[in-house]
UniProtKB/Swiss-Prot annotation:
Gene3D superfamilies: 1.20.50.40
Cysteine-cysteine disulfides: C11-C37, C23-C33, C30-C52, C34-C46
Keyword Membrane on entry: no
Organism of derivation: Euplotes nobilii
MF terms in GO: pheromone activity
Name of the protein this chain belongs to: Mating pheromone En-1
Subcellular location field: Secreted
Coiled coil, from the record: none
Key words, A-Z: Disulfide bond, Pheromone, Secreted
Keyword Secreted attributed: yes
Length: 52
């Protein structure tokens, strides 16, 4: 499982394909590469480079 290979990391603003983060979708949580980051309500969020 990819979740065993990669450790999720906090997504820093401006990171490009360097940080791994958790992606939560209905009924599923997975890890994916962060392609771009932005602030949402004081928290950091990622636009994922791949879908869960």
């Amino acid at each position: 499982n990819p979740e065993d290979w990669f450790t999720p990391d906090t997504c820093a603003y401006g990171d490009s394909n360097t940080a791994w983060t958790t992606c939560t979708t209905p009924g599923q949580t997975c890890y994916t590469c962060c392609s771009s980051c932005f602030d949402v309500v004081g928290e950091q969020a990622c636009q994922m480079s791949a879908q869960c």
